[in-house]
Amino acid sequence: MMLILALLPLSMKAQGWPQDYGGVMLQGFYWDSFADAQWSRLEKQVDNLSTTFDLVWLPQSGDCGGQSMGYDDLYWFPGHYNSSFGTEAELRSLIKTFRTKGIGTIADVVINHRKNVSNWVDFPKETYKGVTYQLLSTDICADDDGGKAKTEASKLGLSVSSNKDTGEGWGGMRDLDHKSTNVQTNVKAYLHMLLEDFGYVGFRYDMVKGYSGEFTKLYNEDSKPQFSVGECWDSSNTIKNWIDATGKTSAAFDFQFRYTVRNAANNGDWSKLAAQNDGNWPLVSSGFFTGSYRQYAVTFVENHDTEYRSATAQQDPLRKDTLAANAYLLAMPGTPCVFMKHWQAYKQEIANMVAVRKAVGITNMSKPTPMATNKEYYAVQVAGSGDKKLLCVVGTKAEDYTPTSAAWKKVISGYHYVYYVSGIEPSVITLPELQEDEQPQDGEFNGVPSFCTVGDGEICAFFEAPITWGSQIYTWAWMKGGDGKDYLGTGWPGVAATLLGTADNGNKVFKWTSANTTAPDNIIFSGGGSQTADMVFENGGYYNKDGLKTNVITGIRTISPNHGDATNIYSLDGRLVRQPKPGIYIRNNKKVVIR
C-alpha cells in the first residue's frame, strides 16, 4: 500500500493530454473570422456544437489595442478583455454556457512575444486581485530582432536582458526572456487566471519553437491545465523532442498528419496516406516510435495558417476532397481538431462521422491497421473499445472497395468516403439531428436612439453597426490633403469608437469623439473585417454601413446674432464660427437659423 501511495503523485503529474481520450475538438475560428467567431454568435450555436465537440479552441481573447486575431497580444488580465470577438462579459458567458453543455474551452496562449504600448520596450501595467503585473525592458531577450530592441532600449536609457533567446527569434514583436523571474511570475499568474477566473480548461500555446520546451513544462506543472497543446510547426522528430522537453506535460499538433492528407487529397493519390511526408511519419502512425506518441497528437487537416484566405494569400490549403479528409481525420487515433470552415460547410456529415467514432470507442491511443492502399482509395481499420472496430475508406473510388469480412456493415457514406463498423450494429448508432443555426439579421434604420447626444462644442459622429461587424468599431478620419494618421495620431484602423447601446432594431450603436478642435473632412468606420466607403464627415452625423442617415442634433429655432448669449456657434461640419453670417448653425446642440 505504501508503495502505491508513494507512486501516486508521479502518476498524477500534469499530463499534456489524457490517455485514451475520446473527445473531439473544434478550432472555433479562421483567419479574419471577426463575425463568425464572435463570442455571442458562438454561444447561440452551443446546442449544435455540443452534439459533436468536447473542446472548442478560441482565438486569443485579450485586448490587443486594435482589430486583431490576437497574435499581437498586449493585455493579459481582466479589465482588458474587450477584443475583436466581443466583450469580456460575452466571453465569460460563452465559456460558462459551453461548460454547462459539456464543452471545455481552450485558450490560445501567446507568450513567445508581446506587443508594446508606445515604444520598443514598454509593456502595460495591469493590476489583478491587488497585485500589479508588468513586464520590463529587461524581460526582452538580448538578441531580440537581431539586436534592434537592445539598440532602441539604449536610446531610452534602458537595457534588455543579458540572456539570449532560448528558441527561434521573431522580429514582429518583443521576444520574451523566459529565464526571467519576472516573466515567469507574470506568465504563471496569467495562466492561473485563465483557468480559475475565466474557466478555460486548457491551453493552445502559440509558436512554441520560439522558446525552450522546458518553460512549457514549468508553466504547466504550476497551473495544471487539463489539456495543453503546442504549435510546434516542424518535422515529427522536432515535435517529439519538444514534447519530451515539456516532460510530456503538453501535446502537440501533428503537422505531418496534416501534410500526408494534403498530399493525398490535392494530388488525387490516396496511397500517399500510407507514405511519409518528406521523410516524416505522422505522430499517430505506427511507423513513428511504434505509435507511442499518439496520446500527445492533436490531428488536423486545415487551420488558420494553411487555409485559403484570398487570391493573394492562398497559403497551403486543401483544394478538394474536404469531406474525405475529415472522414480520415475522424477515424484515426490522436485527438482530431476540426477546422471551423469545414464544420460550417459540412455540419451534418461531420457530426455523423464523430457520432460513429464515439460509438465505436475510438480514442487518441487506438491502433490503426491499413487494409488496402492504391491511388484510387485507402482503407484503414481502427480498433475501438471491446470488439468494436471502424473501417474507413477514402478516395475517388472508395465505394469500389469491398471489406474482406461479412462482419463489416456500412454505417455512413458520402462523397469519396465510406464508414463500416463491426462489433456494433449500425442501428444502435444514433446520428445527431442538428438545428439550423440562427443567421444574424441587421435591422432596418428606424431613427436615432435617445442615448445619442452631442455635447457643447463636441466634434463627433455615430455609427450603427451591422451585426456581423463584430463588437468593436474603429474610426478613421482625415482632412483633405492629409490622412488618418495625421489627424488621429495613429495608424489604420484608427481609433476605437465607444459602444453606447443597442438600437431598437437590434444593431449596436457606437460614438466617436474627436480629440482635435478642428473637424475632419472625411470618415470611415470599420469592424469585423468590413468597412464603409469614404464618407463626408458631418458633425453629429448618424451613419450606418450605407452612409449618413440623419443628424443627432435635433430641433431648429431662429435667433438673432445679437441676442447676448455667449455660447459658441458652430457650422454644420463642426467648425467654430466667430462671426456668423445668415444661415443654419449649431448652438447648444441645436440647429438654429441666424437671419
Annotate the PLM regions.
Residues 15-31, 41-50, 60-73, 95-103, ...:
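Active-site-proximal helices and loops of the catalytic beta/alpha 8
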Residues 21, 64-96, 127-177:
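Aromatic- and acidic-residue-enriched carbohydrate-binding clefts of CAZyme catalytic domains
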Residues 86-128:
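Substrate-binding cleft of carbohydrate-active enzyme catalytic domains
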Residues 466-517, 529-535:
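Aromatic-rich carbohydrate-binding modules that target alpha-glucans
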Residues 584-595:
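C-terminal tail/sorting-segment detector
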